[in-house]
């Protein structure tokens, strides 16, 4: 189901189609175990505002008509009460679009393996360059220190992190909130979901190796991925 549709730009969608796509992606993530209970949220940027999943909603059972609708300034204009993370989402859009103008979807989950890695003080980034597809499809995933869910300080740190990496010439598509979960973004819900899946599966792979020392890809191997596939690492 994850690859059932092409990863079309969100600008090709009407609001009705965007509502349906949020629900389709949420259901897919839930049914395949990438989200659980009422953890996680999905938003889409529209020309005149945003759609976001309601607070405490299960992503597997979303109703397109009940998604929260917000104006360009984040004021709610319709639907059920918006997720408390809307401020974080809007900061991500503002920062990420400086380097990826097509950014139109943000997904946040409490992905088990990603969160597990944050419990062992991994450093400034969640994962090293373990596999070629992690480098190509995800890229650097900076770790943001723990803040309570919805804390404005976390949103500020995330925005600063996105802008710092972008200014350095390595734009990112994901950050990891310590003990909470990843935020990923791309030009459509399907494309953002693909980033999330690759991130969580790489975290799982890392944990499966146990305490063994893992050698990441070499600088030469990463350079080859940059030259061949345009990897942003």
Regions found by a protein language model. Give the residues of each.
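Glycine-rich flexible loops
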Residues: 11-233
């Amino acid at each position: 189901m994850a690859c059932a549709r092409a990863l079309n730009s969100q600008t090709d969608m009407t609001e009705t189609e965007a509502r349906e796509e949020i629900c389709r992606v949420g259901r897919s993530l839930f049914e395949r175990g990438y989200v659980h209970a009422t953890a996680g949220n999905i938003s889409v940027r529209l020309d005149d505002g945003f759609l976001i999943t309601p607070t405490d909603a299960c992503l597997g059972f979303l109703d397109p008509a009940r998604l929260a609708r917000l104006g360009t300034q984040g004021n709610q204009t319709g639907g059920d009460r918006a997720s408390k993370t809307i401020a974080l989402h809007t900061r991500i859009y503002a920062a990420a679009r400086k380097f990826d103008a097509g950014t139109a979807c943000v997904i946040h989950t409490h992905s088990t393996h990603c969160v597990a890695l944050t419990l062992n003080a991994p450093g400034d980034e969640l994962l090293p360059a373990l596999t070629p597809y992690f480098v190509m499809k995800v890229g650097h995933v900076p770790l943001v220190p723990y803040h309570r869910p919805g804390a404005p300080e976390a949103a500020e740190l995330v925005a600063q992190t996105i802008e710092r990496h972008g200014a350095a010439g390595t734009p990112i598509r994901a950050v990891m909130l310590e003990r909470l979960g990843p935020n990923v973004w791309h030009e459509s819900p399907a494309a953002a979901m693909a980033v999330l899946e690759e991130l969580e599966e790489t975290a799982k792979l890392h944990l499966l190796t146990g305490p063994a020392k893992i050698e990441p890809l070499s600088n030469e191997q990463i350079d080859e991925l940059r030259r061949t596939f345009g990897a942003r690492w």
